[in-house]
Amino acid sequence: MRTMNLAGMIDHTFLKPEATEKDIVNLCHEAKQHKFATVCINPAYICTAAKLLHGSGVGVATVIGFPLGATMTEIKVQEIFAAKAHGAREVDIVINIGWAKSGNWEAVAKDITRAVEAAHCCGVTIKVIIETSLLTEEEKQKAAEIVKASGADYIKTSTGFAGGGATVEDVRNLKAWVGQSVKVKASGGIRSRETALQMVEAGADRLGTSSGVQIITV
């Protein structure tokens, strides 16, 4: 795979709580230079990133209900509308993990479906994070089925905040479960070109990483 093709699959990510405006400026500069798909940042910096990336072809992605997924559905929906209004093209939203672990799949489905409807209503791409490191195989499959049924654009492995990230096995399984109707984003622990290529080979359509520059310049 050519470097430029790989770069175009990367969400250049900086979601640390201590992220400064200078960090975001640097992130956007790198994203423009290397032609990454998006920058993925916390909501407070959407306006900054949107201004810096205007006309560059690099999108602005942000996170919703992040990283716990325990925000009320109504708040998640309002976050999506606000993100769009401030310049975000894509949103990465976390499922309510506690509901999933409780087996309350109906509530999980309603939460995600409302978020997907809100995102698509305002023309925003939505990626649903299921936090694979916290789920059993059975729970991962059930979550994948719900994401597929919701009409989401992507299913995403991880927030990177739960002590585990993407694995090749998880990416391969998620792709098998959602089929061609939903894309897969691998995120968490992708720090090398080798790992990135393994994720793509397993079925990942997008990669979330803070190591994008290192990955494409080795």
Curated annotation (Swiss-Prot):
It is an enzyme of class 4 (lyase). The keyword Lyase applies. It catalyses: 2-deoxy-D-ribose 5-phosphate = D-glyceraldehyde 3-phosphate + acetaldehyde. GO terms for cellular component: cytoplasm. Keywords: Cytoplasm, Lyase, Schiff base. The active site is at residues 92, 156, 185. InterPro entries: Aldolase_TIM, DeoC, DeoC/FbaB/LacD_aldolase, DeoC_typeI. It holds the Pfam family DeoC. It comes from the Bacteria. It is found in: Cytoplasm. SUPFAM superfamilies: Aldolase (SSF51569). SMART domains: DeoC. The keyword Cytoplasm applies. Its main location: cytoplasm. Its EC number is 4.1.2.4. Belongs to the DeoC/FbaB aldolase family. DeoC type 1 subfamily. This is Deoxyribose-phosphate aldolase. It comes from Desulfitobacterium hafniense (strain Y51). The gene is deoC.
